[in-house]
Amino acid sequence: MEGLIEELRSRVRELEEELDRVRNGQHEGHRTKIEKMSAEVVDSNPYSRLMALKRMGIVENYEKIRTFTVAVVGVGGVGSVTAEMLTRCGIGKLLLFDYDKVELANMNRLFFQPHQAGLSKVEAAEHTLRNINPDVQFEVHNYNITTLDNFQHFMDRISKGGLKEGSPVDLVLSCVDNFEARMAINTACNELGQVWMESGVSENAVSGHIQLIKPGETACFACAPPLVVAANIDEKTLKREGVCAASLPTTMGVVAGILVQNVLKYLLNFGTVSFYLGYNAMQDFFPTMAMKPNPQCDDKYCRKQQEEFKLKEAAKPKQETVVVEEEEVVHEDNDWGIELVSEVSEEELKAASGPVPDLPEGIKVAYTIPITKPTSGFTVEDSEQSLDELMAQMKNL
C-alpha cells in the first residue's frame, strides 16, 4: 500500500513538473528568441519567406511589423486563427481578451486541441502562440469586457498597452460572436478615437465579413446597426435550449485570413486596404464597399469624432486642380460613334498636300492632289524595237 502511495506521489510530481514546463514554454522544439529579423535563406530562419516580400517590392520595410501592437478581442474560431497568423507574421505584441474556456465542442474549429479542454481560451492560446514564436510579447486578460469594471480596464489597456508602456495599441480587432461585445468595443474605440476592425461569421456558417472603422471618418458599428441592436432585443431570448449556430472551420479560416491580410496592408502600408469586404461561400462572392458615418448616430462619441474629423479636413490646404486641355477630335459626330484622330502633324500634311481650294467654314476636302515633283534631266533613248523583240530578248536572259 505504501509503495502504491509513493508511486502516485512520484507521478504527481512528474505531472507538476511537466505542467510547469508547458506553462513556461520549456519543452522540445522550443527555439530561442531572435533579436533581429533576417532575410537570410536558411532552414533555421523563420522570417526568410516573410522578408522576401521586401525583396520582391511588395513591402518597403517588413521589419516594422515588430513595432506594432494589436489587441484581439474574442479568441474563438476567428480570433484564435487571427492571433496565430499575426504571431507567425512576427507582430510585436498581442493583447488577448476572452472569458470563455476551451471545450470539446470547439474542436470542429481551428487552433485549439482536445488536451486543452478546460483551460481558459486566452491561457491556452498564449501557451501555443509562445511556442510558435517566442519573439512576440503577449498580454492576456480572462474576463468579460461588457461588465462595468472590466470595460474600464479594457479601455485602459487598449489606450496604454502598447509596446512602449503608456502608449495606445495600433489596432483593435473584434472577433467576438455577440452584438453586446461589439457595441462595447465600438463605444470604447469611439471614445478613444481608436482605429479598429470588426469581423464576423453568419449563423449558417456560409458567409462572413470584415470592416475597417476609423472613428469620425467611416461608419461605426452603431451608425448602421443590425436589427437586433436597433430594436434593443435581448440576444439571449433568441437562443433556444439545445440550438446553436452552425460553424465551419473553412469559413472561419477565410474570414480570419482576409482580416489579417487587411491588418498587414493597413500597418505596413501596401496594397489597397478594404473598408468593408464580405464573403459569401455559396456563390464565392466578395462584395466591397465603404460606408460614411451617420450624422444622427446614437453614439455621442461617434458624433464628436465626426465633428473633429470635419475640422481636420477643413484645416488641410486645398490642392490646386490642373486643367488638362483635350486634343481636338476629328469626325466626332457620326452615326457609328467613331472618333478618328490623325497621327500626321499639320506641317507634314501641308508638305505632302497640294493646293487646297477656298471652301466655306466647316467643310474640308477628302483629299488633295500631291505636288508634282520636277523630273530629272536624264532621258532614255528610244531603241525603236517592237514589243515582241523586247520579249524575245528577255526570254534569252
UniProtKB/Swiss-Prot annotation:
What InterPro entries does the database record attribute to this sequence? D-isomer_DH_CS1, ThiF/MoeB/HesA, ThiF_NAD_FAD-bd, Ubiquitin-activating_enz
Q: Where does ATP bind?
A: 77, 98, 121, 144, 178
Q: Which UniProt keywords apply?
A: ATP-binding, Cytoplasm, Endoplasmic reticulum, Golgi apparatus, Membrane, Metal-binding, Nucleotide-binding, Nucleus, Ubl conjugation pathway, Zinc
Active-site residue list:
244
Mind listing the GO molecular function terms for this protein? ATP binding; protein homodimerization activity; UFM1 activating enzyme activity; zinc ion binding
Binding residues for Zn(2+):
220, 223, 297, 302
Protein name as annotated: Ubiquitin-like modifier-activating enzyme 5
Q: Where is the short sequence motif UFM1-interacting sequence (UIS) located?
A: 329-341
Q: Where is this region: Linker?
A: 342-372
Q: What is known of its domains?
A: The UFC1-binding sequence (UFC) motif mediates interaction with UFC1.
What cellular component GO annotations does this protein have?
cytoplasm; cytosol; endoplasmic reticulum membrane; Golgi apparatus; nucleus
Q: Which domain of life is it from?
A: Eukaryota
Cell location? Cytoplasm; Nucleus; Endoplasmic reticulum membrane; Golgi apparatus
- Can you name the source organism? Xenopus laevis
Entry's Gene3D superfamilies?
A: NAD(P)-binding Rossmann-like Domain
Task: State the organism's lineage.
Answer: Eukaryota, Metazoa, Chordata, Craniata, Vertebrata
Q: Which PANTHER family match?
A: UBIQUITIN-ACTIVATING ENZYME E1, UBIQUITIN-LIKE MODIFIER-ACTIVATING ENZYME 5
Q: Where is this motif: UFC1-binding sequence (UFC)?
A: 382-397
A single GO BP term for this record reads: protein K69-linked ufmylation
Q: Which family does it belong to?
A: Belongs to the ubiquitin-activating E1 family. UBA5 subfamily.
Describe the function of this protein.
E1-like enzyme which specifically catalyzes the first step in ufmylation. Activates ufm1 by first adenylating its C-terminal glycine residue with ATP, and thereafter linking this residue to the side chain of a cysteine residue in E1, yielding a ufm1-E1 thioester and free AMP. Activates ufm1 via a trans-binding mechanism, in which ufm1 interacts with distinct sites in both subunits of the uba5 homodimer. Trans-binding also promotes stabilization of the uba5 homodimer, and enhances ATP-binding. Transfer of ufm1 from uba5 to the E2-like enzyme UFC1 also takes place using a trans mechanism.
Q: Tell me how this protein assembles.
A: Homodimer; homodimerization is required for ufm1 activation. Interacts (via UIS motif) with ufm1; binds ufm1 via a trans-binding mechanism in which ufm1 interacts with distinct sites in both subunits of the uba5 homodimer. Interacts (via C-terminus) with ufc1.
